[in-house]
């Protein structure tokens, strides 16, 4: 992450509510220091690599449920649209085009809520592990993952280019920053810049973090520490299910700036 990294800012106007509800999507009301409530829905979903019809159907169902609960914002995991890890499917032009076509179709149906969805962005010949910001039927923003893991089971640098610009958006006057998976594991990564320079109230991290023994506790401790360090609410969503040798355990979290866990998703269950 270079010193010249820019932060893109967007303002979205939404009506906020404070009704307590719960369903297939986990819903949490976050009250910021400005005493404004934001209702956030978290979709801890089981994406299937390459099955765009299945993934789109799961996302659309969660959007309908979040709308029923009058959520302001809904989060989907890293590469929720394509499944993770797509690996050499990323080398197929048809796969990339289906991913982009599915995103456009998905965006057209997003109304009355802000949605963040993981997908693959393409710029000329370069691919980016990205998160799309969907609002009022359009893709209104895009964040490209800045820190790409290339160790153990991860081989992202083979397929993706690194992003160089952070993004913040505002809902009901609440500033929200966006990161993807590995971005949050680096204490001095993009999350720090978003929270210190853009003064984000909430930092979002969409993830595809595989399970191994002790990983849930390590991840939870890290997220709580980042919330304390950045002095921001941290909302984290993770995939569930399995793909090849990888198993994803979910364990999504909402954490207050003091490191207190507000709500926690189930393990190994949507």
Question: What are these model-derived regions, one by one?
Answer:
Residues 2-270:
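Enzyme catalytic cores with a strong preference for nitrogen-chemistry domains
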């Amino acid at each position: 992450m270079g010193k010249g990294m820019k932060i893109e800012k967007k303002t979205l106007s939404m009506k906020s509510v404070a009704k307590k509800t719960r369903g297939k999507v986990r819903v949490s009301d976050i009250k910021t220091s400005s005493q404004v409530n934001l209702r956030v829905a978290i979709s801890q979903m089981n994406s299937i690599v390459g099955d765009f019809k299945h993934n789109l159907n799961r996302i659309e169902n969660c959007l309908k449920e979040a709308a029923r609960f009058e959520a302001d914002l809904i989060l989907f995991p890293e590469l929720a649209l394509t499944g993770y890890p797509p690996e050499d499917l990323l080398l197929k032009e048809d796969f990339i085009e289906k991913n982009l076509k599915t995103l456009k179709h998905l965006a057209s149906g997003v109304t009355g809520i802000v949605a963040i969805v993981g997908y693959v962005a393409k710029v000329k010949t370069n691919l980016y592990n990205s998160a799309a910001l969907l609002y009022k039927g359009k893709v209104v923003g895009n964040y490209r993952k800045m820190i790409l893991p290339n160790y153990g089971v991860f081989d992202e640098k083979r397929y993706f280019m690194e992003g160089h610009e952070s993004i913040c958006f505002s809902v009901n006057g609440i500033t929200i920053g966006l990161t993807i998976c590995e971005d949050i594991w680096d204490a001095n990564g993009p999350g720090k810049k978003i929270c210190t320079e853009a003064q984000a109230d909430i930092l979002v991290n969409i993830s595809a973090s595989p399970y191994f023994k002790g990983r849930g506790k390590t991840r939870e401790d890290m997220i709580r520490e980042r919330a304390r360090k950045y002095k921001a609410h941290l909302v984290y969503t993770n995939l569930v299910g399995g793909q090849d040798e990888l198993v994803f355990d979910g364990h999504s979290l909402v954490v207050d700036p003091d490191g207190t866990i507000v709500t926690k998703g189930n393990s190994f269950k949507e």
